Amino acid sequence: MIQLVPIPFIAATVFLLIRAQFRSEQRRVYFYKPLSTLLVILVAALSFSAPNVKAGYTAGVLAGLVLSLGGDVALMFDSRKAFLIGLVLFLLAHVAYSITFALFNGFYLGDLVSGGVLLALAIVVYRYLEPGLGQIKGPVIAYIAIICFMVNRAASAFLGSAFTPAQAWLITVGAVLFWVSDLMLAINRFRRPFERHHISLAFYYGGQLLIALSPAYFG
């Protein structure tokens, strides 16, 4: 499948990005970070050539990825304003994914199970981060809520018939990896900085790649 061709290049650029982050080579970060996201966008765009493709779903995934690209660029700059811009863009990316998953799959009673688990996790995460949030508690609450909703919509793929089993796994694991990467970043920024937080990029790009692959697997 042509959608798989960019994957080795994504693996290489993400590795080089993480290495540049650890070495504080900012110019290389400015190059490899948007390049990695653009390659993931290419994976999703190539799904238009797949059999049984649903253009609306692919467009929704691409919208989430393009908004994520904007968030990636914003977060390369170390300022409060850039952070808030990145936060808003990633929040909108999660909204785009959530709407896309919901429109194509709907809602089910079983969603309450994953919803309850995610609500409990959201409360625990917020209470842990709260002492370091300062004046941005509101935006962080909104972000936690929407990313948990996005994971809930992704997990719902297992309950309906709109997605194939392969897609359900790609979407759900991708969403969870995205959630984990954001959690690592939040802990590092607001509560307990840790030296190897750049590893979160592996979770982030892994999650985005799995979501980007999902449009190519309609039955």
Stretches found by the model and what they are:
Residues 1-219:
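Polytopic alpha-helical membrane-helix bundles and their juxtamembrane interface segments
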